[in-house]
Amino acid sequence: MLIFFADPTKEICIIGSREDFGRLASLIRAAKGTMLSSQTGSPAPYDRLLGLIVIENKPGESVRFSVTQNGALLIVGDQSKLSILADNVFSISEADDSEGHWHVEYFPDHFFLAPDSFPVVFELTDAKRNQEFSSLQ
């Protein structure tokens, strides 16, 4: 799994395999945990690669994606709203399209996302292509 971050726009791009997204969905559903990601290669056209995902349960809060000062992707929210996110992330792992993607951005009255959440793109790639991509960068 690779996690790209653009500092000026706060955009996050998560590229992973079916297995990566299945593991991530399990952690999100549990509303706690951490997952390492590769920092091998260039972050271009983004500004940097993030090496860690941290998931935390925050009762009563909508889901928020942010980046900590030490470069971790932080995903927080109420367990019920994290569960909605987990269902969607898991569906990526089961997608028919081997290179599909899903945009998660706030809009007014979003059903699980907080207004100040950073925008995220989840992109599915096969494990071999993911490895090749990280070594080419």
Where are each of the predicted segments found?
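Positively charged, low-complexity terminal tracts
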Residues: M1-Q137
